[in-house]
Amino acid sequence: MTLSEQAFAPARRDDIVPVLATARLVLRAPRRSDVKAIASFANDRRIAANTARIPHPYGIEDAEQFIAAVNKREGEACFVIMLECAPIGVCSVDLREDGPEVGYWLGVPYWGRGFATEAVRALIDHAFGDLEHETLISGARVTNPASRRVLEKCGFQWTGVRLSRIRAINSAAPIDRFRLDRGLWASLKSWGRVKLVV
């Protein structure tokens, strides 16, 4: 077994991470078969520069390491966003020092079509309904109003601005910070409950 194969041996989390279905999307655990799509989309500087941890350039090896790492982490939920059986992005709830953090990105060809909002709503429903978190946090670069709109449409409330390191630009940048509490989420659930696919 090669080193690459060893890294992926325990990588399937289909038995741990549920499959979530929305009107147009399916969210499921990352798989080795997603490596090329993830590498292709994440290698776009517009994506990397708007996330904290994606390097630029981003290659196949980066995608392999990402999938191996997220599938080994306990207590986190990472999903590949699927449209018509093809990966179009990633969303996750990561356990951070200041609370569970929602993160997401979509391949550029899928921007502006409501997919991010749809995926994040499903992720939020899972985080509050299944993982039983009390609060979620998230952030968007101040230069990324589209991501800010996604968070606001999902009920997140702005809490301030702070500097955060952006790996792709090798520097810190101002980030709008957001928070969503369980009570507000419960009052906004008119967007409909996500279906859990077993």
Which residues does each PLM region occupy?
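Acyl-donor (CoA/ACP) binding surface of acyl/acetyltransferases
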Residues: M1-A49, C78-V198
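Short loop/turn motifs at secondary-structure junctions and domain boundaries
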Residues: A69-G75
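Conserved GNAT-fold acetyl-CoA-binding loop/helix
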Residues: R46-A68
